[in-house]
């Protein structure tokens, strides 16, 4: 797993769950109804749940009838991480630290460094920002929802005040680091479309399972060795509306710059809130800019506000494209991706597409990117696209 940083802060402060962005938190009006959240209880060192919705996820994923998680002891995880040594740490944040460790592939018992399976061990501070409820929520969802584009939760440890989670290790780290870290190798167009498609596939699966992710952002998108994206950090996930309800009203918690404007204003949460966040990340993939950039001035500090005028005119799309691409991308594909982002960022939630529709369009884009030969790579120059 890549950088694994988390905290909760008010608007204006920088924060990150697996990287760096600002967390927003606001309680709903007292008259608002809070949706119920089923969280796991404990029995004989394993997890049980009192109820779970009847879900019909896609065939690509799997809904387990009960979690299949390993209950680690604290001493086992101390051994696996070499006593949580500083040189084993791969991430740090307000929640605590993440360490690289090794366990047996079948036994899941601690093994020597370099042998067995590499894992990421997330160790929470007792006074950290990620509370017990968020910790349980993550176990609840990742313990039951299995999909190629969700980070796999292998197990947990709960001993007294000690709370740890054990995940599969993601060798390429977070998308945020690849896009924004100084000195990072530029991501080619084909890889960016692969990341967008695989992240959309994970989010689409969640929505089909009636789960609202609520924290879709570049730092929560982790990458495997082949740059397949997997969604991580499910502490803010929420069960979607059921029956004739159109939304869930809840405390406003999310990340500044990624959270949908109507959710921030009203606390009304729908799957279209996630769609907006996806549009922001897609815009980050296209532009190579973070959603909030304090190094910029004026409208350029907010990626969405700056980019929207260029997204609506295909002749100006090149103006928002990441210069690190060196112009090596298909103009038609860039315009198509920009159009997807524009639709996702619609201020009217009902006019945003479903993630299933986004996924279908991105699949076509990713397929065309795979087939793209060098003759289709064009260098975009301002003179050739002036209106």
UniProtKB/Swiss-Prot annotation:
Q: What is its main location?
A: membrane
Instruction: Show the GO cellular component annotation of the record.
Output: plasma membrane
Lineage, broadest ranks: Eukaryota, Viridiplantae, Streptophyta, Embryophyta, Tracheophyta
Which residues are recorded as modified (Phosphoserine)? 219
Q: What is this protein called?
A: Probable serine/threonine-protein kinase PBL18
**Which residues does the record give as ATP binding sites?**
90-98, 122
Write the Enzyme Commission number(s) for this entry.
2.7.11.1
Q: Which UniProt keywords apply?
A: ATP-binding, Cell membrane, Kinase, Lipoprotein, Membrane, Myristate, Nucleotide-binding, Palmitate, Phosphoprotein, Plant defense, Serine/threonine-protein kinase, Transferase
Reactions catalysed: L-seryl-[protein] + ATP = O-phospho-L-seryl-[protein] + ADP + H(+); L-threonyl-[protein] + ATP = O-phospho-L-threonyl-[protein] + ADP + H(+)
- Residues anchoring lipid (N-myristoyl glycine): 2
Q: Which PROSITE patterns match?
A: PROTEIN_KINASE_ATP, PROTEIN_KINASE_DOM, PROTEIN_KINASE_ST
This chain's source organism reads Arabidopsis thaliana
A biological process from GO: defense response
**Lipid-modified residues, S-palmitoyl cysteine kind:** 4
Residue spans of biased composition, Polar residues class: 14-37
